[in-house]
Regions:
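Structural recognition of an alpha-helix C-terminal capping motif at a helix-to-coil junction
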Residues: 31, 45-52, 56, 65-77
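A short, charge-rich alpha-helical start-of-domain segment used by transcription regulators
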Residues: 7-31
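Internal acidic/polar
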Residues: 1-3, 81, 89-114, 141
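Arg/Lys-rich amphipathic alpha helix in sigma70-family domain 2
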Residues: 56-63, 73-94, 110, 173
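Helix-turn-helix DNA-binding module
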Residues: 44, 122, 126-130, 134, ...
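DNA-recognition helix of helix-turn-helix
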Residues: 80, 84, 128, 137, ...
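C-terminal edge and immediately downstream basic/flexible tail or linker adjoining helix-turn-helix-like DNA-binding
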Residues: 9, 91, 114-120, 133, ...
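Amphipathic, Lys/Arg- and hydrophobic-enriched alpha-helical face
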Residues: 22-40, 57, 121, 173
């Protein structure tokens, strides 16, 4: 059963078709959400929200892009908006923690390369991180990224270049320490 037939069946109210469509695309949506958040609970929440929105808006799907690309575009929006909310909450949480802190906290151990890389990716601006994860981690083409995120292919390429440059800069100190 192809996606077009599934869409027609979902529009006709077939719950089995909804489940099949969900099963066909859920892994890719979850992987993107997890790679962007690093948090299983948030990734599951964003995956669920993505499919709620996709099913609510299925009537608007025109078939100009592949269904999977359309769903990934929704996922990208859901994740980026969700991360903005989480970031605002965590910023307030840190400010509160700092206002309650007394004295000097013990020094944390130096992170290893994996932790450094994860932190460097987390520190990227949201759009750079999304393009980096979609291209270098998930294997999307720039055309698919452009379609999913509503940007020209050249913008996707430029953002990937900038993301990689920031990661190189962020990891250069670690590389110098390790080499000496």
């Amino acid at each position: 059963v192809d996606d077009r037939e599934l869409i027609a069946r979902v529009r006709d109210g077939d719950p089995g078709a909804e489940r099949l469509l969900y099963d066909r695309h859920v892994d890719r949506v979850y992987r993107l959400a997890y790679r962007m958040t690093g948090d299983d609970d948030l990734a599951r929440d964003y995956t669920q929200e993505t499919f709620i929105r996709a099913f609510e808006r299925l009537e608007q799907f025109r078939g100009e892009a592949a269904l999977g690309t359309w769903i990934q575009a929704i996922a990208g929006t859901v994740v980026l908006n969700g991360l903005r909310k989480v970031k605002r909450f965590r910023t307030r949480e840190v400010e509160l923690d700092e206002s309650l802190a007394h004295g000097v906290s013990p020094r944390a151990p130096e992170p290893d390369l994996k932790e450094q890389l994860e932190q460097a990716i987390d520190d990227l601006p949201d759009k750079y991180r999304m393009v980096f994860v979609m291209h270098d981690v998930e294997g999307y083409t720039h055309e698919e990224i452009g379609s999913a995120l509503g940007m020209p292919v050249g913008t996707s390429k430029a953002q990937l270049f900038r993301a990689r440059a920031r990661l190189r800069d962020a990891l250069s100190d670690f590389a110098e320490e390790w080499a000496s």
